[in-house]
Amino acid sequence: MVKAVVGANWGDEGKGKITDMLARKADIIIRFQGGANAGHTIVNDYGKFALHTLPSGVFYRHTTSIIGNGVALNIPVFINEIHSITDRNVPMPNILVSDRAQIVMPYHILFDQYEEERLGGKSFGSTKSGIAPFYSDKYAKIGFQVCELFDEEGLKGKLASVCETKNVLLEHLYHKPLLDVEELYATLQEYRDMIAPFVCDTSAYLDKAIKEGKNILLEGQLGTLKDPDHGIYPMVTSSSTLAAYGAIGAGIPPYEIRQVVTVCKAYSSAVGAGAFVSEIFGEEAEELRRRGGDGGEYGATTGRPRRMGWFDCVASRYGCRLQGTTDVAFTVLDVLGYLDEIPVCTGYEVDGTVTEDFPVTWKLEKAKPVLETLPGWKCDIRGIRKYEDLPENCRKYIEFVEAHIGYPITMVSNGPGREDIIYRQSAL
C-alpha cells in the first residue's frame, strides 16, 4: 500500500514528525519533489535533526529511503546529511537514488543569489538553494540527470554547450564571473564518485515492491499554498507540492496512492513573501513564534523567523481538497495552551463580500480575515495519550476546525516526540 504525507498550507506543518511516526510500519520512504530549500525537523531517540534532502525514514533500520526522480538533488548536501546523522551514532541507512533524478549544479545556487540581488525589494524570498534556476533548466531541457554523470564523453560536450548559454547571462545581465567548463567537469566527476554507490532504477525497484505488497510512504515537501499551479502564485516553489505529483516524482502509477495524510498546523506560519490573510504582528506574533514549533518558529533551512497567524480554515480546506485528503494530522496543538482565547479565521472579506472559498492571488492580497474566537484550555496537554483525556475546550477547538475544513482529523500531535500523538475517530 502507498501512503502520502503532504502539507495543507505553506509548509512547516510538522510533516517530518508525522512521516517519522508512520515510518515505523513502512518498508520504503520516498522523497518525490523539491530539494534542500525546505527542511523538516525530527526528534527521536538519537536527538533532534533538521533534514533537508534525506527522507525521514533514515532513522529506522528496517526501511529503505529513496530519492525519487522528481527531486532536485544537491549531491554534496545529500552526502553531508548522511555524515551528519551517522556522526551522531545513527546506523548507516539504506538509501537509493533514482538514476533519473536531476542534479542541482553549483551555478544554480549562484544564479539564485544573483537573481535575488537583481530583483532587490521585489524578490520572492528565495532560500537561495538554487531551486528556481534548477527547475528552469530542467524544463528547458538543459538540466543534468544523475545517469549522465556516467557518460563522460556526452557530459563534457553538453556541459560546454550549457556553459556557453549561462555565460551570456553572467556577462551581460548579472555582470558576474564566467563559468569554467573544465572546473565544472572536474566537480561533476567528484559528484559521480560520491553518488555512485546509491544509484539505481528506483522506479523498477518500486514496481517490484508494490507487487510484493510492501508498505510505501511518499514524503512531501512544503504545502499546497506553495504549489506552482494551485498555490499563491508567484510566491510559490518550483515543483508541485501535491500528493498527485508523488506518482510522477517517484515513478509509480497514480492509482497506487491509497491514503493521503495531509498535515495541518493548529495555527499558521509561513516563511517568505506573499499574501497571508490570518497573519498577526507585534508582541502577539512574537510570543506565538517563541512558544511555537520545537524551540521556536524559525525556518529549518534559513533560520529566518517565520511569519505567524491564526488557524486559517479557508486556506486549510482548500489545501486539503487539492491534496485529495483522506486523513488530517493536526499538529503543535500543545503550543496554544497559554492562550485565554484563540481566534480562528473562518472566512475572508474581499471588497465587502465574505467568502469561504480560497481566491486567486490578486483577490487574496485584498482579503481581510473573518475571525471567530474560541475559549482556550489554559494548561499543558503534553503527555496525554487519549482523545477523551484532552480538556473540553481543546476537544472543542479540534472539532470546530474539523467541521470548518470538512476533512477528518484522525491524528493530533501534542508534542515534538514520536510518542506525542493521539489517534481519534472522526465523525466525518
Predicted segment positions?
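Non-transmembrane, aqueous-exposed alpha-helical and coiled segments at domain scale
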Residues: M1-L428
